[in-house]
Amino acid sequence: MAKISCSYFLVLMLVFSVFSLVEKTKGKRHCSTIILPESPCVPQDCVEYCFEEYNGGGTCIASKTGRTTNCMCTYNCHGNNL
């Protein structure tokens, strides 16, 4: 009987922890934009510009193999007045 109660308790804890994680992420939407698509991406500049302008994270990505990289900025849509 004690083993069953312990199992139920652990399952209950797991369910509550999942619900708490879902509630934390609910309502947070991330947007992304390409910054200066006509110029090649410089990683340090991309990170700094994205943080200063959008309070987000910038990464250099290539749209297709062999093409120059562009700066993609991912940020919280609700945290900016854009």
UniProtKB/Swiss-Prot annotation:
<dbReference type="GO" id="GO:0005576">
    <property type="term" value="C:extracellular region"/>
</dbReference>
<keyword id="KW-0295">Fungicide</keyword>
<keyword id="KW-0964">Secreted</keyword>
<keyword id="KW-0929">Antimicrobial</keyword>
<feature type="disulfide bond">
    <location>
        <begin position="50"/>
        <end position="73"/>
    </location>
</feature>
<dbReference type="GO" id="GO:0050832">
    <property type="term" value="P:defense response to fungus"/>
</dbReference>
<comment type="similarity">
    <text>Belongs to the DEFL family.</text>
</comment>
<dbReference type="Pfam" id="PF07333">
    <property type="entry name" value="SLR1-BP"/>
</dbReference>
<protein>
    <recommendedName>
        <fullName>Defensin-like protein 156</fullName>
    </recommendedName>
</protein>
<feature type="disulfide bond">
    <location>
        <begin position="31"/>
        <end position="77"/>
    </location>
</feature>
<feature type="disulfide bond">
    <location>
        <begin position="46"/>
        <end position="71"/>
    </location>
</feature>
<keyword id="KW-0611">Plant defense</keyword>
<keyword id="KW-1015">Disulfide bond</keyword>
<dbReference type="GO" id="GO:0031640">
    <property type="term" value="P:killing of cells of another organism"/>
</dbReference>
<feature type="signal peptide">
    <location>
        <begin position="1"/>
        <end position="27"/>
    </location>
</feature>
<dbReference type="InterPro" id="IPR010851">
    <property type="entry name" value="DEFL"/>
</dbReference>
<feature type="disulfide bond">
    <location>
        <begin position="41"/>
        <end position="60"/>
    </location>
</feature>
<keyword id="KW-0732">Signal</keyword>
